[in-house]
Amino acid sequence: MSVKLDEKDLAILTLIQENSKLTANQIAKKINIPITTVFAKIKRMEEMGIIKQYRAILSPEKLNLSTAAFILAAVSYRAKNEDETPISQRQVAEEIARFPEVQEVHIITGDWDLLVKLRAENVDAVGKFVVDKLRLIKGLDKTLTCMVFETVKESTSLPQTFRKNLLKP
């Protein structure tokens, strides 16, 4: 469901994505509107679910979690014997999502069913996660682990292309 926003809404969203610690007063000054308008627009966008959360972005390297990996996983949809109930992609994805090491789980198309992103202390910790936790999940057929050498871009901000799609006519 798409919503229509005005230029001020989009300016507020852009500023909040860049720095969620900005006060309403700082936002009002930057985009030259009354502070009451900023409060009202933010409240409306929160109620509409456009603004879901405010959070800090932590440095994995400073917290000894500098190793990132992406794991492709295939789900076995058929029960191994007649007594078992088949398991769904979603069930396996939800089980994987419970692990604290896991940052993201996506149900995808193609030869693989799931894409998992995780952070760990080192390559050994990634290996232990895959062998001792991930591969024990019922319904998981096989995995392919891709270690990250270097991250060129990592962002939680939505691209600015949303601007043209959401502007009120």
Name these PLM-found stretches.
Residues M1-P169:
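A compositional/biophysical signature of low hydrophobicity enriched in polar/charged and small residues
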